[in-house]
Regions:
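Short, Arg/Lys-rich segments that mark the N-terminal edge of DNA/RNA- and chromatin-recognition modules
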Residues: 3, 17-21, 30-80
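A structured, charge-rich N-terminal accessory region that forms the first stable segment of a protein
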Residues: 2-15
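Short, solvent-exposed cationic patches
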Residues: 91-104
Length: 104
């Protein structure tokens, strides 16, 4: 199946239509996150999947937010700035989203 959004699975970022693989928490990962051209990725996790999007605050700073759709509702979790978005932070956010979605 064809996909357009970059995916994070098994500790690696996979670019669509490319053999490029970037290990999470590597300098290349943080550079990819900081690149203005990259605004979203899909994150697959045992606690559930989400879409992470880069958004701009009113002050002009960029940060990442995880989104999941459940029962017609959108649940989101703040991920942080590009330089702070580690694999551990992503996993913590997925567990938080899973707990919150279970209460809906």
């Amino acid at each position: 199946m064809s996909w357009k959004t970059p995916r994070v699975e098994a500790g690696e970022l996979h670019e669509p239509h490319s053999a490029l693989r970037i290990a999470l928490d590597s300098p290349a990962w943080f550079a990819w996150l900081a690149d203005e051209r990259h605004r979203s990725f899909h994150f697959a996790h045992p606690a559930g999947d989400c879409t992470a999007r880069k958004e701009r605050k009113q002050r002009g700073d960029w940060y990442w937010v995880a989104y999941r759709h459940v029962h017609g509702r959108v649940v989101k979790s703040y991920l942080g700035k590009s330089e702070c978005l580690t694999e551990a932070r992503l996993c913590d956010a997925m567990r938080d989203l899973a707990e919150r979605c279970a209460r809906l």
